[in-house]
A protein has these predicted regions:
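Short, conserved catalytic/metal-binding motifs centered on acidic residues
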Residues: 1, 27, 64-73, 88
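Active-site-proximal, Lys/Arg-enriched surface segment
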Residues: 1-21
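Gly-rich Lys/Arg/Thr-decorated short loops/hinges at beta-loop-alpha junctions or inter-strand turns
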Residues: 25-36
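Active-site beta-loop-alpha junctions of metal-dependent nucleic acid enzymes
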Residues: 34-55
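Active-site beta-loop-alpha junctions enriched in small/polar residues
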Residues: 35-37, 69-73, 93-95
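A conserved hydrophobic secondary-structure block that centers on an alpha-helix together
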Residues: 55, 60-67
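Short, surface-exposed basic-aromatic patches at helix termini and helix-loop junctions that form
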Residues: 78-87
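An anionic, glycine-rich sequence signature occurring as long contiguous blocks
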Residues: 87-137
Length: 137
């Protein structure tokens, strides 16, 4: 295809790499960018986060909960969210970490362990690490 911005995605298809931000339980669109398909999801995300948080602050004074995918698990994003007084959930990117080591840490740090059905155990807790970061802009 010759559409502007279309390129090979990481899944091997021609397409785009959109990024979108919604607010509220109703899911109102606050911000969106249609980015080139070959672009990594973290590329330009710090600026998008800042812009989106500023837009949300114009809409509400309520606390913000930001959810990000594992591709956005970066110290820079965490720093922006901490400085902006946002709550956040970021899917962990294990990178080169051992899944077994991560599971042992999760079990050790859990304050609540439930078994909603046979064969499924849910560990709920938190573990905070010091994060140092610099922003690109």
């Amino acid at each position: 295809t010759r559409k502007e911005g279309v390129s090979r995605t990481y899944k091997g298809y021609d397409g785009y790499a959109p990024i979108m931000a919604y607010i509220g339980t109703e899911g109102y669109l606050v911000n969106a960018q249609l980015r080139e398909g070959k672009q990594h999801c973290q590329c330009d995300t710090p600026a998008f986060l800042r812009e989106t948080i500023a837009m949300c602050r114009q809409i509400t004074d309520e606390p913000l909960l930001i959810r990000l995918d594992s591709g956005n698990d970066s110290a820079e994003n965490i720093g922006i969210l901490l400085e902006s007084d946002c709550y956040f959930i970021i899917k962990r990117n294990l990178r080169r970490e051992s899944k077994d080591d991560w599971f042992e840490m999760a079990k050790a740090k859990s304050q609540n362990v439930t078994a909603p059905r046979e064969g499924k155990t849910v560990y709920t807790g938190s573990d905070w690490k010091p994060v140092s970061y610099t922003t690109a802009d």
